[in-house]
Amino acid sequence: MATKKITLVIPDAGPLISLATGNALDLLLALRPGVRLVLTDFVYFEVTVFQDRFLDGAQIADFVKKHQAAIEIVPTSIGEFAIPGIQEKPRNNPNVPWPNDLGELSISSFVTTSKDFNPGEPTLVLIEDDWFTSHAYAVPGNVHLLSTSAFLDGLEAQGVIESAALIRSAIQSKRPGFKIDFVVDKEAQKIPEGTSWRESFSRDKRAT
């Protein structure tokens, strides 16, 4: 039985920052026709709110603006609730709570509420820490979890990039906390056929 190919890609904040740091955001656009790239409102807010202070935030904002026809920014209940309060006072104000898991929760919320059928369309969520793997209850059954490092390895195997190691090295040189050895490639748990993501990316579709 053939596995279900991914039709929706949603990166968390960590992968966006790392790919920006490694000048590799364009890899997210190497998608075959019919595959959507989505950012939740809170993840986008989280990575760009201080774009005037951090180069990666400015890079992400410019990237999204340049490719707005190919990137969807979707509203979520998390973003609707949290963003206005944070905008009123800076994040570095200790009196303003900013839980670390709001981005992940916004992704989980979007995937869960946007389903037209069960278990839902095969969805790839790019991650960079163990929040999703440690909170299985928050992972919708149609979600395939993939870490940044595993993503780069897969793109190399698919011929989209020449060297995953070079991009990882570029990321780590500017982002020492990047976890090169955090490798996760976990299929969706409630799609009986299983899920695959590599075929959803093509070397011919990479942006320039």
Language-model features: locations:
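Feature 3881 marks metal-assisted phosphotransfer/nuclease machinery
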Residues: 1-11, 19-69, 93-105, 109-122, ...
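Conserved SAM-binding loop
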Residues: 125-126
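Acidic catalytic patch
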Residues: 69-97
